[in-house]
Amino acid sequence: MINLRQQIPHYLRLMRFDKPVGIFLLLWPTLWAVWIAAKGAPSFKIAVIFIAGSVVMRAAGCIVNDFADRHLDKHVQRTQMRPLASGSVSVTEAMLLFAVLSLIAFTLVLLLNRLTVELAVIGILLALVYPFLKRFTHLPQLWLGIAFSWSIPMAFAATVGHVPAVAWLLFFAAVLWPIVYDTQYAMIDREDDVKVGIKSTAILFGRYDRLMIGLLQGSVLLTFGLLGWYLRFNYWFYLGLLVALGLMCYQQFLIRHRKPPDCFAAFRNNNWVGFFIFLGILLTYRN
């Protein structure tokens, strides 16, 4: 018999509510899209649905990820105490929790138009496939970027009824960004991942990891600059990009010796990159 009160802390850890930075990394691209699609004046309903949906889907994605990795996580020092790997949460409990979260997410999306619902189905499939890719390809971070950015076409579909070209330009920038921060994250476990057969961009890039991260960071900022020019954004947006550039340079400084704590700090610092880009968008529409 499950003691629900005792299990709640384990459920919260399974959904990573003890590590909220992941929620924000998913939320920032969503907010970029919601604000740009509505030209700075999103409806309260759409904003709430997408914010709540980001929180719920991130939690559901963490459960799927831990389910897929439950046998591998036992062999990686950083992950061996995750609830499924350690046995503090059973597979049955995890799947029931995933079903509840999926039902909540599906209920939220049903409040939007048909195109958004159809795009949401694709988004769910992207999220379900991602955790299993690290066994077969060194590019799971690319798939993560697509999955994490799928809220962008959804936000435009919900707001304007279609997905215009500008949405795909924003989508491209947003896809590149998770490759940056998840490569930094994968650098933490690189040695353990090689031992257990997990693949990642950190392993693929090898000694060129900092160079590749830098090229990707530059591509993100360049694409955002093109987006700002296309939408005729004012100087506030470019000030936001300038701060983001400074933060990315700081991340390069942090990972220069590739020490796990510093790589983790660089990963977490990306929350501020997303925030200042959003702040630039917000101030652009207010001035």
UniProtKB/Swiss-Prot annotation:
Its main location: membrane. It is found in: Cell inner membrane. GO terms for cellular component: plasma membrane. The chain crosses the membrane at residues 21-41, 44-64, 91-111, 112-132, 139-159, 160-180, 211-231, 235-255, 263-283. It catalyses: all-trans-octaprenyl diphosphate + 4-hydroxybenzoate = 4-hydroxy-3-(all-trans-octaprenyl)benzoate + diphosphate. PROSITE patterns: UBIA. Pathway: Cofactor biosynthesis; ubiquinone biosynthesis. Its cofactor is Mg(2+). It is a multi-pass membrane protein. Keywords: Cell inner membrane, Cell membrane, Magnesium, Membrane, Transferase, Transmembrane, Transmembrane helix, Ubiquinone biosynthesis. Belongs to the UbiA prenyltransferase family. This is 4-hydroxybenzoate octaprenyltransferase.
